[in-house]
């Protein structure tokens, strides 16, 4: 089975723990080489975050465990890249013109 190389998640998280702490915990997981967390919306109690993880063998179940233990929930899996290498999206006719 191919290994997950990149995982992009839409997550709803409380303000605590901070994104710094969450990124540190996620980056400590085996198979994870890099973590990026961006907050794109915030209200009084929660933050909406885009979490991107890259590595040579990202384990979704372990990632989910860290996220849930932090009090957050995964809204959606927005991108998955698996296989021997990472490929970027290719532009298609369905993509809007910019």
Where are these regions (language model features)?
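Long, contiguous binding/interaction regions
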Residues: 1-98
């Amino acid at each position: 089975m191919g290994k997950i190389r990149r995982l992009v998640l839409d997550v709803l998280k409380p303000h605590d723990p901070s994104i710094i702490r969450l990124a540190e915990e996620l980056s400590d997981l085996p198979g994870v080489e890099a973590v990026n967390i961006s907050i794109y919306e915030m209200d009084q109690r929660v933050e909406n975050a885009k979490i991107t993880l890259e590595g040579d063998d990202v384990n979704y179940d372990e990632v989910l465990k860290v996220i849930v233990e932090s009090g957050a929930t995964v809204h959606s899996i927005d991108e998955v890249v698996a296989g021997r290498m990472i490929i970027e999206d290719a532009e298609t006719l369905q993509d809007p013109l910019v």
